[in-house]
Amino acid sequence: MNLHEYQAKQLFARYGMPAPTGYACTTPREAEEAASKIGSGPWVVKCQVHAGGRGKAGGVKVVNSKEDIRAFAEAWLGKRLVTYQTDALGQPVHQILVEAATDIDKELYLGAVVDRASRRVVFMASTEGGVEIEKVAEETPELIHKMTIDPLAGPQPYQGRELAFKLGLTGKQVGQFAKIFMGLATLFLERDLAMVEINPLVVTKQGDLICLDGKLGADGNALFRQPELREMRDLSQEDERESRAAQWELNYVALDGNIGCMVNGAGLAMGTMDIVKLHGGEPANFLDVGGGATKERVTEAFKIILSDDKVKAVLVNIFGGIVRCDLIADGIIGAVAEVGVNVPVVVRLEGNNAELGAKKLADSGLNIIAATSLTDAAQQVVAAVGSK
């Protein structure tokens, strides 16, 4: 779950990390009033969306008058911002962040992720701030300095100082960086984050460090114990089908293809998508119904897949272990009866109660294509799409 920049900065402030004075505004009038609270210009106005690349898309601007602030707010509030990280529709803009402009001398990068290989929280710092860290990692990986947090000892001030020295910071900046490092590490651990970035972390012309931007992602599996973060969730920034799936504890990710996939198990789901691609098809989604699938969840999964207008056929691939194939069959029958299906449905059932599931589908009278293997299923669903 991602948060907006203004929400990330609110959390930064609570953990003792410096950020520009700013206000999130929902109307042009609020934006003008925010400028008055901040004081004399120039100011920076930023569209608040869950996507990078806002500046290049016109969603970030330095302005010198309140009239310009109003014009920016009127131009963007209620509209959609399209960046290289969004789809063609873009993301809706419901808030504008108005901040005091900062005199920048240098731009740095500081971020943290959970590294699965080491099973540790790993901090990354670089002198190449203001650009995508992925690009830096690809082109000049030697400019990224890493620091691993010991899960027993926790973050230590000396680790922050060590990173500061590697970034070429001196004097008071070393202490400032160490404080930001400790605040960010504490925030990461206490709030069950999956990712956090300050990009850029700037050195001002006065020699001070300020968190100029903030990107924060929470671990969705830990939200049950983070009620404050749950309240910050902006569902308007998420895919409607993905949000609906999450309510039913379904793992769904929308893709750009036209073959809907319903599978149990993340590994099998990825393998199913691969074999569909291998035979010339394009998956419309990743959907894992999980091991504890019920008839109701399977029905809802089917409805979510069919709510995508791009879907021209559906492939159901179930290996019955924990989940019973006859329950999957009941869910398919229930979904078809409730929603109505006008696209071909290819079903491959193997394992626990597969014969009973196949019999239920055959007796239902539904127009379902039975597959004998995963390869057969992929070939049949690709052929079904090609014939439409």
UniProtKB/Swiss-Prot annotation:
Keywords: ATP-binding, Ligase, Magnesium, Metal-binding, Nucleotide-binding, Tricarboxylic acid cycle. Mg(2+) binds at N199, D213. It catalyses: succinate + ATP + CoA = succinyl-CoA + ADP + phosphate; GTP + succinate + CoA = succinyl-CoA + GDP + phosphate. GO terms for biological process: succinyl-CoA metabolic process; tricarboxylic acid cycle. Its cofactor is Mg(2+). Binds 1 Mg(2+) ion per subunit. Pfam families: ATP-grasp_2 (PF08442), Ligase_CoA (PF00549). Pathway: Carbohydrate metabolism; tricarboxylic acid cycle; succinate from succinyl-CoA (ligase route): step 1/1. One of its GO terms (molecular function) is ATP binding. It comes from the Bacteria. InterPro entries: ATP-grasp, ATP-grasp_succ-CoA_synth-type, ATP_grasp_subdomain_1, Succ-CoA_synthase_bsu_CS, SUCC_ACL_C, Succ_CoA_ligase-like_bsu, Succinyl-CoA_synth-like. HAMAP family: Succ_CoA_beta. NCBIfam families: PRK00696.1 (NF001913), sucCoAbeta (TIGR01016). This is Succinate--CoA ligase [ADP-forming] subunit beta. The lineage of its organism: Bacteria, Pseudomonadati, Pseudomonadota, Gammaproteobacteria, Enterobacterales. The gene is sucC.
